[in-house]
Amino acid sequence: MEGLLIHAVLRELEKELPAQNLGLAFPEEGTAAILLKGRTGRLFNLVLHYRPPTPSLALEPGRLQGEPKTPFQRQLQARVKGPLVEARQLKLDRVAFFRFAGEKGFVDVPPSVLVLEATGR
């Protein structure tokens, strides 16, 4: 995925930040979908396709389904908690950073940064 396309998706996403994180779904082995409720009330998924040769990201409406299938997906589900407070890209690089605030609860989850490197092979 080209840096300009990533920039366009992030620009659209920034209009909705901070966005409430309503949970993760894993429709495929190489895909994570984070259900978000944006600042405007819009409900959408931040969909990350992270498996080469064509990693990408997109904003999609509706609710996607799927349980974690790999240890990596189980780690994502355990650590990506709290509102999405920032989405950024360095220059027009093919790397995107998503900062989540974490959450307080029975077991506190610290803030985390999810990095998507959409460079392919």
Question: What name fits each language-model region?
Answer:
Residues 1-121:
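Gly/Gly-Pro- and Ser/Thr-rich, intrinsically disordered tail segments characteristic of DNA damage-repair
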